[in-house]
Design a protein with these regions (language model features):
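Active-site core of metal-dependent hydrolases
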Residues: 232
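Acidic/glycine-rich phosphate/pyrophosphate-binding loops and surrounding catalytic core
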Residues: 1-225, 229, 238-246, 252-254, ...
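Short, charged, intrinsically disordered terminal tails
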Residues: 279-305
Length: 305
């Protein structure tokens, strides 16, 4: 799994997040990013050490290199040790990442680092639950484009950390004919989807083609042209089974639309190749992480939640 921070988009997003929280108006004499409160109250020579950990069990780690990148962007002299790799499952209060550096710099970096990790760990943890629920059937668990604007690179990476797979990264890397496209193609003729697939292939011969269908009739039309994927949208499990049989050896099948964790196993049992889930990125919430640190000289102790 490629490190998410190798992506230029990820690096740019980290920079934007720090600009949002810290701006560039307040810098110390060495040019470090910092917050106004630390400038006023914290000894510039104070050095702190600490860890990030999950307060609950079963958390799937995601975003450790992002947190490290945040800290290094604030102050390159902060030492960061990754204790648990992305994709690891941790116990309550088990350290994920350790750090040492100027207290002012750590105070400046901590919230942004935690914001990234809390969201990414939540997505990875929810993805893992769906993967575990469907693994008996070998069903792929896919994400969607229902991501937070500007943060897609992190959220889709977090899905990988949880054992899921990425659907298309954007509208540029796969042809996906949804209901609105179908309505605009020959007046929405359900018996002309094979012709739509052929038109898409002529326009973009190097891209996979996927067609969303909502009925057995539409599936029968689409599969004639053998698109790489057929998306079964909001179908009953009984109809999914019929579509899977219809598409066998011709097209892969993707179940989509309102699939909950309770229903995931039943959907996977229909034999679909994959299930796609918007909830992985738009409803995962946030994992309760804590960053605890200690000032090396003196007795001051602090915790940020």
């Amino acid at each position: 799994m490629r490190d998410v921070m190798s992506s230029p988009r990820a690096k740019s997003a980290v920079r934007r997040a720090l600009d949002e929280d810290l701006g560039d108006a307040v810098r110390d004499v060495a040019g470090h990013w910092l917050d106004a409160t630390s400038e006023a109250l914290v000894d510039p020579k104070a050095v702190a050490t600490g860890e990030i950990y999950s307060k609950g069990g079963g958390c799937v780690v995601a975003g450790v290199t992002v947190a490290r990148a945040v800290m290094k962007a604030v102050d390159p002299k902060i030492r960061v040790e990754i204790l648990k790799k992305d994709g690891s499952v941790v116990k309550p209060h088990e350290p994920i990442l350790a750090f040492r550096g100027r207290a002012r710099s750590i105070l400046a970096a901590e919230r942004t680092a935690l914001n990234f990790m809390q969201r990414m760990c939540a997505t990875a943890t929810l993805t893992k639950k769906f993967v575990n629920a469907t693994k008996r059937y070998g069903t792929l668990v896919l994400d969607t484009r229902k991501t937070t604007p500007g943060l897609r690179v992190f959220e889709k990476y977090a899905v990988l950390c949880g054992g899921g797979s990425n659907h298309r990264m954007g509208m540029y890397d796969r042809v996906l004919m949804k209901d609105n496209h179908r309505r605009l193609w020959r007046g929405g003729d359900p018996d002309a989807l094979d012709k739509a697939v052929e038109a898409a292939r002529r326009a973009f011969p190097k891209l996979d083609v996927e067609v969303e269908v909502e009925s057995l009739r539409e599936c029968a039309s689409a599969v004639k042209a053998r698109p790489e994927w057929i998306m079964l949208d909001n179908m009953s499990c009984a109809d999914m089974k019929k579509c899977v049989k219809m598409c066998s050896g011709k097209s892969k099948t993707e179940a989509s639309g309102g699939i909950t964790l309770d229903r995931a196993r039943e959907v996977a049992a229909t034999g679909v190749t994959a299930i796609s889930l918007g909830c992985l990125t738009h409803s995962a919430g946030s994992v309760d992480l804590s960053l605890e640190w200690r000032v090396e000289k003196g007795r001051e102790r602090a915790r940020r939640r």
